[in-house]
Amino acid sequence: MFTLDSFRKDRTQHRQRQCKLPPPRLPPMCVNPAPGGTISRASRDLLKEFPQPKNLLNSVIGRALGISHAKDKLVYVHTNGPKKKKVTLHIKWPKSVEVEGYGSKKIDAERQAAAAACQLFKGWGLLGPRNELFDAAKYRVLADRFGSPADSWWRPEPTMPPTSWRQLNPENIRPAGTGGLSRSLGREEEEDEEEELEEGTIDVTEFLSMTQQDSHNPLRDSRGGSFEMTDDDSAIRALTQFPLPKNLLAKVIQIATSSSTAKNLMQFHTVGTKTKLATLTLLWPCPMTFVAKGRRKAEAENKAAALACKKLKSLGLVDRNNEPLTHAMYNLASLRELGETQRRPCTIQVPEPILRKIEAFLSHYPVDSSWISPELRLQSDDILPLGKDSGPLSDPITGKPYMPLSEAEEVRLSQSLLELWRRRGPIWQEAPQLPVDPHRDTILSAIEQHPVVVISGDTGCGKTTRIPQLLLERYVTEGRGARCNVIITQPRRISAVSVAQRVSHELGPSLRRNVGFQVRLESKPPARGGALLFCTVGILLRKLQSNPSLEGVSHVIVDEVHERDVNTDFLLILLKGLQRLNPALRLVLMSATGDNERFSRYFGGCPVIKVPGFMYPVKEHYLEDILAKLGKHQYPHRHRHHESEDECALDLDLVTDLVLHIDARGEPGGILCFLPGWQEIKGVQQRLQEALGMHESKYLILPVHSNIPMMDQKAIFQQPPLGVRKIVLATNIAETSITVNDIVHVVDSGLHKEERYDLKTKVSCLETVWVSRANVIQRRGRAGRCQSGFAYHLFPRSRLEKMVPFQVPEILRTPLENLVLQAKIHMPEKTAVEFLSKAVDSPNIKAVDEAVILLQEIGVLDQREYLTTLGQRLAHISTDPRLAKAIVLAAIFRCLHPLLVVVSCLTRDPFSSSLQNRAEVDKVKALLSHDSGSDHLAFVRAVAGWEEVLRWQDRTSRENYLEENLLYAPSLRFIHGLIKQFSENIYEAFLVGKPSDCTLPSAQCNEYSEEEELVKGVLMAGLYPNLIQVRQGKVTRQGKFKPNSVTYRTKSGNILLHKSTINREATRLRSRWLTYFMAVKSNGSVFVRDSSQVHPLAVLLLTDGDVHIRDDGRRATISLSDSDLLRLEGDSRTVRLLRELRRALGRMVERSLRSELAALPLSVQQEHGQLLALLAELLRGPCGSFDVRKTADD
């Protein structure tokens, strides 16, 4: 049986062999022919083992070096014999080696040589036991061991000439049989996926900048043709300098002309009997003839070809290493021409009637010195008081205004609680005894005597459900129940709700109203006094804004603190500082696993109470055991977890097979399957449904993910009917807090999604990585909570030893903008670095500074790190700062409802996408977007259609709409809840008169909601500087110039459009500018998944910052001062009017932010209405000369 240990043993042997490689230059490895020229048995065996040897060699080298073609690394040299053909294969990677092959035909000889090379590669460890390829990362390691690292980023040689071969001939030579340069550049070959992912692909202007820096020796000119016949000694010297001249000539011509053959451009004519005279006619780069002699035809031709190579080198068409230049360098003139076109500003064309309207408006409402300039806009003085001190304290338990109980009320309520407690009946006695119960006195005494206590309890000890009840019992039975108001945080919504329901059930009907929960979009708070409130960490953070000292709260219990999510670490900073403001408050940290002593030290050496848990026996199976059970004797191809965490992969078929095997042969009971993410959950669910077919009714397949609304997730706790097996497919959301009682089998993929932030590229990457050993323990424990169980780990035992003990805290690996904004809301007097340095694990100072700079860049913080007027508004809106900014601007620009939909859909995808139907979803999005060029407006139309069918109250119509548009009803319900929540936030931020206005078409805040270009422009203004400029032409890492391809340039560098955005496949873009919300890093490249084309005038008029103008009195250019992505040109009058219009819009925004929007004077509202009408009309106009054409294969 093939096991991981045997695989590693083989790999070690491979590495030992490759460490003992012979010197760089080896003698040819010969595959000897059989008598008569037939293929020998040994050769047939080789070809049987390597049936496609040439493709295999290309694939190995291509993957290792990250190139799509390996022509330069594999050179076949042919020699004609009397009865057989001989091929010498020159291999240039990983070492310079020659391999020979023979055959009756040239192709047979090539295949034999290639097969021999494959055998050599396998012996070096470059192929797996079954001749399979390795991943690129491993090849890089192998190459380093060879002392021949993979090619680095391509740069022009210092001697490469800064010109094009077209300049060699003033007549612009077009060789016979080709269409010349223009034809070759117009024909773009189809790009494969690997090339599309190349990190090194750059745009034309960047390449030209590099070329100017690195290139010093221009191409020498060659006017007209030439005829060269030299003495034989010169030809021999040339042949010594160029030992494979024909191959070099062919490569040069093929690269320069983008052709697959050089036959038409290099022609030999050989005459003579004893002495052969070879004439080489070279039609590129201009007609040239070379003559040489030799005893054999091949010798004469090689000498002539060597003379040609020498000539090309003198012209600068071959580099100093006698290798061809790149395609881009041969076509530098065209590159420069295209680069010059790209650098030109785009012409502004504003119709004369609109210009007159702008002049009239500015004449009536001049932008004078009374307007606050953009520089002053960053100051936070004299703003509308919208912060946490602007209103009465809020009761953290009920959410109502807080008023302390009088002494009489407290006594009365305490007595009432005591009576209710005594009337509970036998329910408490019926509750199962849990491991935490015998430790009740120790726990309660510690909490009473110490402000902070850490409770470390194993899985199943009952700390989550029982300790809040123990606290309540102690207070109630001592006659002070009214003083007991406990807030218990949970890391996830489903945990908060399910635990609250469990505790409510255990307390019984008489005290049920004293237990409640509050999560996003769903709330059922308890009555005040003797209250247990279960909520998410984010909810408690919001409560701290309106009650900074948590007055009215007796205890805060932070459960699952070991998970170290970013909100929990942030909460601990606040709670640590809160001890000085509210010394009576008791803090309890509860952890299942983790470094609990670290929490103790953080809170000054507070006590740690360890509670042993109880688990039923759990039998564990690892991958090698599982494969044996399934009758698989080797690793499935898609389930080879590589050593690099970046390349963890999961075979969904293996997961499905295992679940079916457990169902067929395992013990009765539920199956809980831990999967990395939503795509994997949907993939396994679809496979199970297909496999079960007509028997699906005997199974309850339940996905559990944060994408699913609470009402749909509650089904996992329900007992299935007799004869029905429950199969739960979950992320790590099911690892802690919640208990599904009938789970007997746990399938652990060993993987989860983890967000990581790249400081260099400033993008996040949601990676699939190995879990920690603590996660494995937690997952295993789900099978032994209520009965004996089984755990199936889809990784080898040896992998467990390599897993890290605990997860890296989220605060150390995620973007910090949201955290910094929260810090400014809670403690505005502290700098971000100062505040976050108080975390259990302080984040990188550079990461904090980057977050501060971004918030300053989007106008949320001023230079002193105080909240600006805009920041004060954003503080009320619970979403990403950039999305919150877009919402605020949408209220001001009166297009609010579509922006609420967009922001909600960026929070929760409305489409029912999976690994199998991505292409179909992309087609639906393209249809929904119409001709708007916007993924975001596709969201708006999808939700609008759903709201329309809901009004019909026709179930069939609703189901048809969902099916036709591949929409997911639970996500749409969640989006509806988000829109409602954001509406409340906007009302709290004084941006609308009442929450219902936000979705009312006739409300003033939605006056321009139908203006698509304005909606996209406002979204762009919120997301700025997330702006893309589309540029024509690119140069690949291999130096291939592709004039009909496009690159996507941002302020930070080049990015790629993901296939999921409709603009990726668009054959024509109406605008060169796109906006986007989020970029993610994958496989070394940065991708954008959502995008919208935006009008260039929207970019000019609606972005923050200054503009720069160059005006000669007749024509003027205007550009963004902080970016080179936008340069527009027009007549001086047009540019001047647009600049003043931009200032008028800035004044409107500033006025709106400095007072309650609905309370602005009527005259000001009318002025703003006229300005917005003018803006909408301007953006309705054509983009003029901003069209960009793309080839279909881009």
UniProtKB/Swiss-Prot annotation:
For region Disordered, the annotated ranges are: 1-27, 153-200
User: What SUPFAM superfamilies does the entry give?
Assistant: P-loop containing nucleoside triphosphate hydrolases
Q: Where is this motif: DEAH box?
A: 559-562
Question: What's a single GO MF annotation on this record?
Answer: G-quadruplex RNA binding
Location of the Helicase ATP-binding domain: 444-612
**Predominant location:** cytoplasm
Q: What gene is behind this protein? A: Dhx30
Q: Where is the composition biased (Acidic residues)?
A: 188-200
Q: What class of enzyme is it?
A: hydrolase
Query: InterPro entries given for it?
Result: DEAD-box_helicase_OB_fold, DEAD/DEAH_box_helicase_dom, DNA/RNA_helicase_DEAH_CS, DSRM_2, Helicase-assoc_dom, Helicase_ATP-bd, Helicase_C-like, P-loop_NTPase
Subunit relationships: Identified in a complex with TFAM and SSBP1. Interacts (via N-terminus) with ZC3HAV1 (via N-terminal domain) in an RNA-independent manner. Found in a complex with GRSF1, DDX28, FASTKD2 and FASTKD5.
Alphabetical UniProt keywords: ATP-binding, Cytoplasm, Helicase, Hydrolase, Mitochondrion, Mitochondrion nucleoid, Nucleotide-binding, Phosphoprotein, Ribosome biogenesis, RNA-binding
Q: Where is the composition biased (Basic and acidic residues)?
A: 1-10
Function recorded in the entry = RNA-dependent helicase. Plays an important role in the assembly of the mitochondrial large ribosomal subunit. Associates with mitochondrial DNA. Required for optimal function of the zinc-finger antiviral protein ZC3HAV1. Involved in nervous system development and differentiation through its involvement in the up-regulation of a number of genes which are required for neurogenesis, including GSC, NCAM1, neurogenin, and NEUROD.
Q: Does the keyword Lipoprotein apply?
A: no
Please indicate if the UniProt record lists Phosphoprotein as a keyword.
Answer: yes
Q: Which Gene3D superfamilies match?
A: 1.20.120.1080, 3.30.160.20, P-loop containing nucleotide triphosphate hydrolases
Offer a single GO CC term for the protein: mitochondrial matrix
As for family, the record states:
Belongs to the DEAD box helicase family. DEAH subfamily.
* Gene Ontology annotations of biological process type: central nervous system development; mitochondrial large ribosomal subunit assembly
Enzyme Commission number(s) from the entry: 3.6.4.13
Tell me where on the tree of life, at the top rank, the source sits: Eukaryota
Q: Which residues carry this modification: Phosphoserine?
A: 6, 226, 380
Q: Where is the Helicase C-terminal domain?
A: 654-827
Name recorded for this polypeptide: ATP-dependent RNA helicase DHX30
| Residues given in the record as ATP binding sites | 457-464
